[in-house]
Amino acid sequence: MLLDAERELRDYDPAWDFAPPAPEELTDCPAAAQFGQMLRLWKREYVYEMMRLGLEVTPYRTLEHIVGVHHVAVTAGRALRRGGVPLDLALVSGSAIGHDIGKFGCHPGERVPYLHYYYTDQWFRRRRMTDIGHVAANHSVWDLELDYLSVESLLLIYADFRVKQTRDDQGREVTKIFSLAEAFDVILSKLDAVDQAKRRRYELVYARLYDFEQFMVSRGVDVTLEGRDTPPLPEKHTALMTDREALTALTLQCVGHNIDLMHRLTGQRSFASLLEQARGETNWRRLRAYLGVFESYSLYLHIPQKVQTLAFLYELLMHREGDIRRQAAALMGEIIAGFHAGYAKERPADSRTDAGVPTDLDQWKLYLQKIIYPDHKLMPQHRRWIRYTLKFAVGSLLQRCPGREERFLAPFFAYYRHPDQLEDDVAFQLLDTAAGLPLPALTRSRQELLLRFAQGLCQREDITVRAGSMLLVDRLHRLDPGSRRPLRILQRIDCRGSASLELLRRRIMEGGVPEPLPEQVISDIFLDNLKTATPWILKQVNIRLLEDYAAREDGPVLHIATHLSNLIKVSDRVTVRHSAGNALLALAPRLTVDQRNEVSVELSRGLELGQQEFAKYIPDYLGRFALWLPPAQLEELLADLSQTLNAASVRMVASALDTVGVIYEEYDTYRARFPEEPEAYRSRRERLLGMLMKRLAGSDGGARQEAMFVLGRRVFGSGSLGEHEKRQAFLLTEQKLLETCYEEAEDALTFYYRASMLGRVYRFMTEQRLFHGGFPFEEPRPIAFFPGTFDPFTLSHKGIVRAIRDRGFEVLLAIDEFS
């Protein structure tokens, strides 16, 4: 009552009084109901009164900080909404009001700056306001290390960054709203143990805030908070921009696309709609785009959305396309590994996991059981497909949970304790998965467990189980060559019904240079590999035998390489295609130039089939194999690919784009194999990039989507392409990439492809700007206008333009629609 009377007697105080949005401002806000509940609880639990008392009994000005953050966030949020940015003002206001409430829950002796995030999360979770609580509890400056955040989270972190406490002349805390640059210095002076690595992290998150502030300025927001908001700033035409202006514009476009995408993902309705669109997709390339969205952004989803995504991905384990099943399983492992990544703050020593809240371990145990033992009501083929994905889920999870492997491995290895109780299908998948486990997972005790497991299965009637046992024992033998036990188990394996198994056992036990294979045996292996009735594990054994034999000086390398190329094109099992492709790449150095050319021609013809079930696996291996061709033959292959890029079939164009992308990504290896003049090397690389950009500007939506996918994955998001080459690619494509941002997306899928590409481009641009000295742009050249309409088919017009360009001018010209 006293505080109510105080408000009536004095004017509004921006340091002590909240000004939440009016009800009419929240009519289209999904979080409006939660926000209303929060305001009611705020009064019922006397939260504001507690904060006022905190000013009296503690030296900290927490209330003033919270009010200041709310003022900055809501003021900027209102202006952004007027600028056309979709955001939930109720979510902004609620999270800003409650973002530091956890400071009042910290116990004596606890580190408030580190633990108040946890108590904030608990306050909202216990009152079932998880949407607001998720944003409120994740407002640390280090949360900006996540590449993608919603605009509501960005506003809260931005406001919290700018509102800081300083000391007056008498040492008392004073709350002040700083500019972004001033706040950078204030926070840097307060950080604990600032070394070079921590400063680098801090500069990265500051750069993200700076880009967000510039984005707000471009939308008309007055970041000085003096009320001088304007309409969104007019956009300059791309062709009239300098390189630096284009860089700034592209950065803002990347920020805007990320905000738009996170708006679609973080809303419950929009996310459910996205899942339904993905469920209804039948084209594997389009479905791959949805999986790419989940792969890039799943880390930033709320826990209920991650649970929904895992359920959807489990359904995809029954998809008819093997690559989709593999990608879905790997993504399941990735999501489980990052299940709690959205809340990775420090916790009190006595904290407990809330009952009823899903955990990463719960989800792992659930889907481990569902993958190993699918529902018996499913079709047998679907159950086999689901089980086969086990090794991809396990491998992906272990790759992405460094330091936490043991908690996930314990429930997994529990399935290996009783081999005698397992059905053949289950036993085989466990054998196959164990053979591919990373070395750190195979401790001495686990090696013993797996040896007992393989020994218990080596006499099974099913030949695939016996083959799986042999491959697992071989892996364990290579880990400990001095042990005789694996060899004793190998001798016990029953090889009846398969000459290949007998040959492999002999090869493992004898070691050394492989014995030559008789002509009849090679012929039988070729025939078995082309039969659909031959189990895929035996085909892998055959491929291994052929690869070992081809490594001999007298091995029939071309004969085997041709067979492997055929398997890549026509095998009915995805894993056989990949095994054959890797074996072919291993044989490439042993082939003569003519033999390499012959194999590459055969693979190129596979692209021209235009049938996705045959052509989709070829680009990855054709692209890398092509880099074993001498320059003349490589130029011929590129000419053929250039022709394919002009085809009317989207499938053929997509396969050619994928191949060009692989060649571009792996092209650094070519210089060591075939030394050339630097100009020839550079010219060919630019030609490859031009082939990708050609379809980015085409009229066909499917081809443009594939070009975006390849540019994002193989160029700017590549882990193997050097920073220098990425920088050169960016300098050549910067304005063209910017131009694609202004094109209207024909459908939601094009938007997702573009957002995925721009996300990788933005990450690359930020790292270049901060850690590699930025981009070496040339000074703007003088402008020359070509009079009239330029005719690209007239040699005299081309000659005039080239002559002017060679004199140091940038030539602007007009082309009519008929040219």
Give a label for each model feature.
Residues 51, 69-73, 86-127, 133-143, ...:
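His-Asp-centered metal-binding catalytic motifs of divalent-metal-dependent phosphohydrolases/nucleases
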